[in-house]
Amino acid sequence: MIPRYSRPEMAAIWEPENRFRIWFEIEAHACDAQAALGVIPKAAAEAVWQRGAFEVARIDEIERETRHDVIAFLTNLAEHVGEEARFVHQGMTSSDVLDTCLAVQLSQAADLLLADLDRLLAALEARALEHKHTPCLGRSHGIHAEPTTFGLKLLGHYAAFRRNRERLERARAEVATCAISGAVGTFATIDPAVERHVAEKLGLAVEPISTQVIPRDRHAAYFATLGVIASSVENLALEIRHLQRSEVREAEEYFAPGQKGSSAMPHKRNPILSENLTGLARVVRAAVVPALENVALWHERDISHSSVERVFAPDATIALDFALARLAGLVEKLLVYPEAMQANLEKLGGLIHSQNVLLALTQAGVGREAAYAIVQRSAMKVWAGEGDFLALLKADPEVTVEDAELAACFDPASHTKQVDAIFARVLETQEN
């Protein structure tokens, strides 16, 4: 991922130094287990820890000749360890190192993403509570529908990201497995106790059954989860973009002193963060299909999955980490305009209360189809600019509801009377 959309801690997970450090730990812990089993001398295992080291540049140099990254690493490691290096990697295959390392890296990435989600959830909850009773328009198909509150809008996104957090916890647990089982997963040349020891030291579970590789359905579920989270990011970003339209302007991104929106038009205040998040969501989702396609490999293994994972695993996790942090900051500083929300509520002259009128007529004994036609007749006149909705209804002889009851249909509070109950349902579920 390019530096522009990278944060240091997540990017560091995918740097060669971290990858080779994990490789070293896998090999060194495996030596400890082999020594405990009497397969290699204890002094050899100690030598690996004491003298073991690596240089990224040297590994790259060796790989240019060997065309094999794990062999290049082991060769460089042997240059430091010396004679005892012949006991390193006993009974193991390259995928034992590669796949176990990837499990560690994906676990590390998930931990950062979970922290990102916690910050975002805290921001959404705080802003939702702040605007719990701030009335605003609910829209369907982009058209005014009925009143809701801005707090409810944000609460819906909060609930989605809470579900996403639960999904990511499950995906992390599923992908965090260690496989050190030899050439085709049969443990023919290595004791399963070695796998158990390395898994414990690295904080992983053992892979119950592997081939030469850890089954890629685990990784597919992980990246599918990242794709869902990215779609939730885009969903909220898209809402903010729509609300910041000049014709709407119910909310907008914070515009910092000295910030500029256009090289040509000094007046512009553009939703650039939300637009950026929409784009980054596409980058993250781009990993989902390749991850699914990696599930099907030839027999006990081929390397068709390897090149793709080396690209999309860093890119997807780094991009999502950046996006979640940016979205949290956006929510924390989001500018909200209740006056504009109220003005938009009143813009259509009461049409947003049409369902209340429909229900009042049916309660008064009018058939639903007939009631719908009566209400729609007046509503279409309002759309055409031919009058006020309430006045037109009062003047309609087919509207049999008393004026006081009709006026009550236009009470905005009737639409939001269950807000407290909805908040309690969402937030109490969190506590339980």
Q: Where is each model-derived feature located?
A:
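Active-site-adjacent "gating/activation" loops or surface patches in catalytic cores
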Residues: 195-212, 216
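A helix-coil-helix interface module used to build multimeric assemblies
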Residues: 1-187, 191-197, 206, 259-262, ...
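Conserved hydrophobic residue
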Residues: 40, 45, 248-249, 367
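Generic, well-ordered alpha-helical scaffold segments in large soluble proteins
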Residues: 33, 76, 80, 123, ...
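Short amphipathic alpha-helical segments with heptad-repeat character
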Residues: 107-118, 125, 155-158, 162, ...
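Glycine-rich anion/phosphate-binding loop at the beta-strand->alpha-helix junction
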Residues: 164, 212-305
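Short, well-ordered beta-strand elements within core beta-sheets of diverse protein domains
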Residues: 152, 220-228, 356-364
